[in-house]
Amino acid sequence: PIKSSAASDVYKRQACMNQSAGGRGSFILRSTTGKPEGPYENIEGNEDKAIFPNIDGSLFEDTDGTVYFVGHNHYIARMKPDMSGLAEEIKTLKESKYSPEPYVEGAFIFKYDGKYHLVQAIWAHRTVKGDTYVEKEGLTNKKTRYSYDCIIATADNVYGPYGKRYNAITGGGHNNLFQDKDGNWWATMFFNPRGAQAAEYKVTCRPGLIPMLYENGKFKPNHNYQAK
C-alpha cells in the first residue's frame, strides 16, 4: 500500500492529483461526494498502475472545459470528459529548451491574458563564470547549486511551442499560480532545503504563498503587497 504522497493538488472538478513518494508514479483520485474533503476513490485510468510513471502530476482545465494532465516536466495528455482516464497518448510539450537541457520538474500549466503559461522548477547554479541554468560537466555540480527557481514560458497553444523561459521567482520553485476572489495573484512554494541560498536560512522545506504581479506579459513577486 502507498503510505505517503508528495506534490498533491486538489482541483475544483473534485479530483485529487496524488504522487507517491515511494516512486510509484502519479495517480488521480476522485471525490465520491463532490466535496474537496472526500472521501476519494481510484479512477479507472490508474486501477492497474499509475496513470503516469513519474512524479509531479497536475491538472489544467482550459476555458472550454477540456481538462489536461500535465506530468513531471515536459508531458501532457487530454483527459476524458468524465475524468476516468486519459483520452490520448501522453505527448511531449514543444518548448524552447536550454542547451543542454538541465533537469526540470514541477510542471504546471494555467491560462491568463490569452496565453498558456508553463511553470517549471529548475536549479540555478552559481559558478566562476556566472549564474546559469545550463548544466555543464566540469563547471556545475551539486555543490554549485544556488537557488531552486520558478521559471515560466508562454504559448498560444496548450501543446506549445512555448517561448523563451524567464525567471519568475528566485529560490521559490515548484509552484501553482492562482488568483484569489479579489483578483490578486499568488504562487505556492515549498522552499527546497538544498542549495547554497537555502543554507542561508534557519528554516526551510515549508509551504508558503508568494504574492505575485503580472506586468508586461510576465509574472514576478509583488514586494509591495500588504495584507488586509
PLM feature segments, named:
Residues P1-A7, Y11:
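Single conserved hydrophobic/aromatic residue that forms the stacking wall/gate
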Residues K12-Q14, T66-V70, H117-V119, W185-T188:
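Conserved beta-propeller blade signature
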Residues N18-A21, Y75-I76, W123-T127, N192-A196:
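Short glycine/acidic-enriched loop and turn motifs that connect beta-strands
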Residues D9, E61-D64, K111-G114, Q179-G183:
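Residue-level detector of Asp-centered blade-edge/turn motifs that repeat once per structural unit
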Residues E101-K164, G172-G173:
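Loop/turn-rich, solvent-exposed surfaces of beta-rich toroidal or solenoidal domains
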Residues S5, I55-S58, E105-F108, G173-N176:
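Beta-propeller and closely related beta-sheet repeat lectin domains
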Residues R30-F52, K80-P102, G138, I151-T170, ...:
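Blade-edge beta-strand/turn elements of extracellular beta-propeller
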